[in-house]
Amino acid sequence: LVGSEMCIRDSDTVVAFRVSSSQDSVDFSSLNKLKCPDSVIRLKNIWDIYKFNGDAIISDFDLITKDKKSQTIPDGVQFLNKDLIFLEQGAKLPFCTLNATNGPIYIGKNSEIMEGSLIRGPFAVCENSVVKMGSKIYGSTTIGPHCKVGGEISNSVFFGYSNKSHDGFLGNSVIGEWCNLGADSNTSNLKNNYAEVKLWNYESESFINTGLQFCGLMMGDHTKCGINTMFNTGTVVGVFANIFGSGFPRNFVPSFSWGGNKGFTTYLTKKAFEVASLVMERRGCKFTTQDSEILKEVFEISKKYRSY
């Protein structure tokens, strides 16, 4: 785009626009309209993040590897469809299996795929992330930067700095930043009666039909769950929740909740932010005043949902 242009889709949906950096406001009626290519992925619902992840990986793979040369696949790695496997500088992958038959596999800078891991594309692991020994990962899955993952993962997206280091199944799910799933935590992604999954929707403040048969866990930033946690099909968890104990917790856990199947209390911001500061400091990051102010507002907005 050049100055005073915008890209639109479906006649009125603004995808992108470009104006002067000195403008305080934008008059869209004054901008020249350009039709957005139909190939551009549009996210209308939270589950679209994993639903269209395979398409996104394929598109991004072509873009990020253009005019670049992959590092050599090490001896001992078993692979299929070499042309759709790309290794960035510093990637380590001893004795694993990479199958790019169904889509590309991208291994980010300084990431590690430990021995015995089985990976099917489309798959992307971003820089400085680790796939633990013996992991089984199906497409279409993306592991964000600075993550540690293990166990069995299928068609899921991890944002940065989140961990699922141990055994347990995660499928058709979206995990935010700074999350941690305890050992042997499992997510159901299919109802026993094979019915379409309903998911909590903040806009309507109700459960809505996704039209999907497979839908797992939507977990907000800074949320943690203890060992052996079980999540039911179509569970939504807000930010800064701490879930533990036996049995299935409710399938909508509001932000700043503390507890599990036997009940919840409010996770107060003072303690929540102390933990976040410690967690982020371990990774060389800082929990800023701006972070605190934004999340205090989230705490207030989400109060109405914490009617335990």
Language-model segment annotations:
Residues 1-7:
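Short, small-residue-biased leader/transition segments that mark boundaries at the very start
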Residues 9-13, 20, 91, 156:
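Active-site neighborhoods and metal-handling regions in enzymes and metal-associated proteins
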Residues 107, 113, 130, 140-142:
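Structured core of small recognition/catalytic domains
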Residues 118, 124-132, 136:
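Membrane-embedded translocation segments of transport machinery
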Residues 133-134, 140, 146-308:
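Glycine-rich hexapeptide-repeat left-handed beta-helix
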